[in-house]
Regions:
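Bacterial N-terminal signal peptides that target proteins for export
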Residues: 1-6
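Bacterial N-terminal signal peptides
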Residues: 7-15
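Sec/Tat signal peptide C-region and signal peptidase I cleavage site
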Residues: 15-21
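N-terminal secretory/targeting leader peptides
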Residues: 22-111, 127-324
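Signature of the catalytic double-stranded beta-helix
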Residues: 113-125
Length: 324
C-alpha cells in the first residue's frame, strides 16, 4: 500500500510540475538566421529555457515559416496566434510608435537613447491596447540611401523610385523629388533587377547585407532609424509566475541591447566589405543635413497634428528629451 501511495504522490508531483511549464511559439519578421536580429531572438529563447529551469520554453519561427504577414505580427501576438515576437513592422498596429522613425528627428545614438526613454511609457500603453506587453527591443543602424544610380546629394533622388518601409520615409523621398514605393523585403531583389525600384532606404547591416550586389551606390545620409519591438501576448505573460516574468524582462533587456550593439558593429564590417566589393560610398555633409532637418521639421508638426492631441504631446516629449 505504501508503494501505491508513493507512486501516486510522484505522479501528482510530476503532473503539477508539468502544469507550470509554459511552451510559447515565437515569430520574427526576419527570414535570415545569420542576422543579428535572429541571433538575438535565439539567445533569448535559449536563455529563457535555461534560466527558468524549463518553466518557460520558447520555440522561434523565422519569417515566412508561419502564415503571418510582416505587417500583422503585433496583431497575431495580441490575438494569441503566437505568444512572443520581434516586430519591425509594428507601425500599422501601433502608429504612435512611428514617432521614433520620423525623418531627421533623431540623428544619433545619444538622441535615440534619450528619445526612447522619454516615450517608452506611451509605447507601453499603446501596445497594451492591443493586448500586448512591450518587453523591449533593438535598433538597426541609421537608414541610408542605397541606389542603382550615382547619388552625391539629395537632389539626385529626383525622378527615381525608392523603396521605403514607412509613410514617414516616403515623405522624405517625396520631399526631394523621388517616388516612394512600399515593398516587402522578399520583393526587393527582383524589383531592383526589373527596374521597379532604383534604390532602397536601409542599413549596410540590414537589407544591404543581402541586396548589395544590386546596389552599387550608398549615400551615407542618415534619414532615420529603424527599430524592432520585442513583445508578448498579455494573457500568456500574465499567466507566468512573477519570477518568470521578471526573468523574461531582464533577458529581453540584456539581449535587446546586445543585438543593437551587434548591429552597430556589423554595420562597420558590412560597409567595409561592400566597399571592397566595389560599392561607391559617399559621405553626407553637415550643410545638407541641416537643410534636410529644416525642411522636414514642419512635417513632424503636421504629422502629429493630423493624428491628434496624444501625438502632439508625444512629439513634445521626444523633442524636449533631445533638445530639438
Amino acid at each position: 500500500m505504501k508503494h501505491v501511495v508513493l507512486a501516486t504522490t510522484v505522479a501528482l508531483t510530476a503532473t503539477t510540475t508539468l502544469a507550470h511549464a509554459d511552451d510559447w511559439t515565437a515569430y520574427t519578421y526576419s527570414s535570415v538566421s545569420t542576422t543579428a536580429a535572429v541571433k538575438g531572438m535565439t539567445r533569448i529563447a535559449d536563455r529563457v529555457a535555461t534560466e527558468t529551469n524549463g518553466d518557460l520554453n520558447i520555440t522561434l519561427h523565422l519569417g515566412k515559416t508561419l502564415q503571418i504577414a510582416s505587417a500583422d505580427i503585433t496583431q497575431a501576438v495580441g490575438d494569441g496566434i503566437v505568444e512572443f515576437a520581434a516586430d519591425f513592422f509594428f507601425s500599422g498596429n501601433v502608429p504612435i510608435a512611428r514617432i521614433l522613425n520620423l525623418p531627421m528627428l533623431i540623428e544619433n545614438d545619444a538622441q535615440w537613447a534619450k528619445a526612447y526613454a522619454a516615450i517608452e511609457p506611451t509605447l507601453v500603453e499603446a501596445f497594451a491596447d492591443q493586448n500586448v506587453v512591450l518587453l523591449g527591443g533593438y535598433r538597426y543602424p541609421e537608414q541610408t540611401i542605397f541606389t542603382t544610380f550615382p547619388v552625391t546629394s539629395l537632389s539626385d533622388l529626383e525622378g527615381h523610385k525608392i523603396r521605403v518601409t514607412s509613410p514617414e520615409q516616403g515623405k522624405f523621398i517625396e520631399e526631394f523629388g523621388g517616388a516612394p514605393i512600399t515593398l516587402s523585403g522578399s520583393e526587393v531583389p527582383t524589383s531592383l533587377e526589373r527596374g521597379v525600384i532604383e534604390g532602397v532606404l536601409t542599413a549596410s547591416a540590414g537589407g544591404a547585407k543581402n541586396w548589395h550586389e544590386f546596389l552599387p551606390y550608398d549615400y551615407r545620409f542618415a534619414v532615420n532609424y529603424g527599430n524592432s519591438m520585442i513583445i508578448a501576448n498579455a494573457d500568456a505573460f500574465d499567466a507566468l509566475s512573477a519570477e518568470t516574468q521578471e526573468k523574461l524582462r531582464s533577458i529581453v533587456a540584456e539581449e535587446g541591447a546586445a543585438t543593437t550593439a551587434d548591429f552597430i558593429e556589423d554595420e562597420k564590417v558590412q560597409m567595409a566589405s561592400q566597399e571592397k566589393a566595389g560599392m561607391t560610398i559617399t559621405a553626407s555633409n553637415a550643410t545638407e543635413v541641416a537643410m534636410a532637418t529644416e525642411t522636414l521639421a514642419p512635417y513632424w508638426e503636421s504629422w502629429a497634428e493630423q493624428n491628434g492631441p496624444e501625438y502632439v504631446e508625444a512629439l513634445k516629449v521626444v523633442r524636449d528629451a533631445i533638445g530639438k
